[in-house]
Design a protein with these regions (language model features):
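Short, solvent-exposed mixed-charge patches
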Residues: 256-257
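Sec-dependent N-terminal signal peptides
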Residues: 4-13
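A short, amphipathic edge element
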Residues: 25, 56, 135-147, 196-201
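N-terminal mature ectodomain segment of secretory-pathway/periplasmic proteins
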Residues: 22-108
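Sec/Tat signal peptide C-region and signal peptidase I cleavage site
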Residues: 15-20
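Gly/Pro-enriched, hydrophobic low-complexity segments
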Residues: 78, 89, 101-105, 111-116, ...
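Short amphipathic beta-strand and strand-loop transition segments with alternating hydrophobic
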Residues: 62-64, 146-152, 205-207
Length: 257
């Protein structure tokens, strides 16, 4: 009996040590390095829900291509009619200190707006609860990451990591992320304002493999201070498809689908 108890104790210790052998930075780096193909396509259904329960729906098609550590993305709204043809182009740079390039084309005005570095952090994308900055990735070393603890969400063991921006001009004081240990996919993120109060909460579900790549099927971003939320559902996901790299420019953005 003593040998059995000792063996159990050793196993429990091993699991405990294993859960904490990765640093916060290493965990976030594994999330960023999760394979997702060189190119990607998806259809997205967005539901914008107000605190009173009223809803608006949007439909979007998206294409993305990796170029080294950088990523170019093109999105077009296809529904409803009042936003159909609206396009969003991003060139997301991994280099620290280099602002991403972002353009928003509004067909009703026949005008392309360039999104500046400062407004991309504070302005919300097309009435959603996602900022323009949310539409791209952050370099791992733009933040200091700290492993906090392990938690279980929906039966999955998760790392909990706190990320604090090194640049104090960022609008958030910190983010706390819950990351599945088995696949290094985020399932939850909390964003805290400069006063340390929870501002937004992102919940991610329907995590599965498509073409061998781990993907997110649904994301719900809620502004907990205004009670407005955006429900984003992905469909028709495709990876490593043939995409013309020349499509990721302002001319194509203004031309549309």
């Amino acid at each position: 009996m003593k040998k059995i108890l000792l063996a159990i104790a050793v196993l429990m210790t091993a699991f405990s040590v294993d859960a904490q052998t990765l640093t916060g930075r290493e965990i976030i780096k594994k999330v960023k390095d999760n394979p997702d193909g060189e190119t990607r396509y998806a259809k997205m259904d967005l539901v914008l829900e107000k605190a009173n329960g009223s809803k608006r729906e949007r439909k979007v098609e998206s294409w993305a291509m990796d170029i080294g550590e950088d990523t170019k993305t093109m999105m077009f709204f296809t529904y409803p009619g009042d936003v159909k043809g609206t396009g969003f182009l991003t060139w997301n740079y991994d280099e620290i200190g280099k602002d991403d390039d972002k353009w928003l084309y509004m067909p009703a005005l026949k005008k392309t707006r360039r999104i500046s570095g400062s407004s991309s952090k504070t302005d919300y994308f097309m009435g959603t609860d996602f900022t323009y900055d949310d539409m791209g990735d952050r370099n791992v070393d733009e933040d200091d990451h700290k492993f906090l603890r392990m938690e279980t969400i929906d039966g999955h063991e998760c790392y909990v990591v706190e990320s604090v921006p090194k640049d104090k001009r960022e609008i958030y004081s910190k983010r706390i992320s819950w990351i599945r240990k088995d696949c290094f996919m985020g399932v939850k993120v909390e964003y805290y304002d400069k006063l340390g109060k929870l501002h937004r909460a992102l919940n991610i579900s329907d995590i599965k493999q498509v073409q061998g790549f781990w993907t997110r099927g649904k994301m719900v971003m809620e502004n907990v201070q205004t009670k407005h939320k955006t429900i984003l559902t992905f469909s028709d996901l495709k990876f490593d498809l043939k995409i013309d790299g020349e499509m990721f420019n302002v001319t194509k953005l203004e031309k549309g689908l």
